[in-house]
């Protein structure tokens, strides 16, 4: 019997003195000349590894299961069966505890019935908790925050958008923790109300101040900006109080409603707008969550049709 070109190692004694020893059940048998033991060298681990490579490409990439079938040579039926097995074996959720955890919280709608609420450690850039709810309301978020308490995390701050439900829930469960408003959300919402080209001097001046929000980095910047906002209000207080009567309905509405709404939005957010200046470890925006949601929805569009459990 001929020696192997690519020499195998005996699994029993480790010898490389191996010879072919016939065929059984369509598998090549080998015999060790050193210890006399015979064995069949199968490679199930390679097959399993290959399957997982295709699974990763499907889950994390942009290929559909039809694309994977065409590239890999496996049938769609086999791929679905293998992938379902992997999906049923969800990875173990491990939380890394450390001092001064700064949490980003936000929600997004995956469809009309499922709202994903995500809690992310800003320092570790890791999701520490998530939940699905029928609506992004105060009670659902309180339930999540109570679950966070059981993890015994040392939470130092929360950063969120202007959702009243999130703000009330955090205030209820963590009344003494710093709450930072996302300055990007504040700026974006205010600019949407003021439009790109305001028609009044009040709107033009306020828009200029709004565009400075995300560039405020120091205590001096903060104090100077707040001073300008107060001066703006002193100058235009009567202007934003003006009302117009609808001739058809007789209803009175604010004449410059968008300018007024922008100022009120800033005024309400102001107590929690600049926590990050006193503590630079506190993130001042939830951009990383917005980016994560964007990638997640891109993947969900590729995998549309999967069951809710998966």
Identify the function of each model-found stretch:
Residues 72-164, 168-176, 269, 288:
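RNase H-like nuclease fold core
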Residues 3-9, 25-28:
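Short metal-coordination and nucleic-acid-contact micro-motifs, chiefly zinc-binding Cys/His arrays
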Residues 14, 19, 24-103, 107-114, ...:
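Short, positively charged, Gly/Tyr-enriched micro-motifs
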Residues 18, 32, 68, 79, ...:
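Mobile genetic element proteins and their domesticated derivatives, centered on retroelements
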Residues 158-164, 169-207:
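Conserved beta-strand -> loop -> alpha-helix junction used to position metal-binding or nucleic-acid-contacting
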Residues 38, 124-125, 302:
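Short, surface-exposed beta-strand-loop junctions and turns on beta-sheet-rich folds
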Residues 29, 41-43, 51, 157-167, ...:
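Acidic/histidine-rich catalytic cores and adjacent linkers
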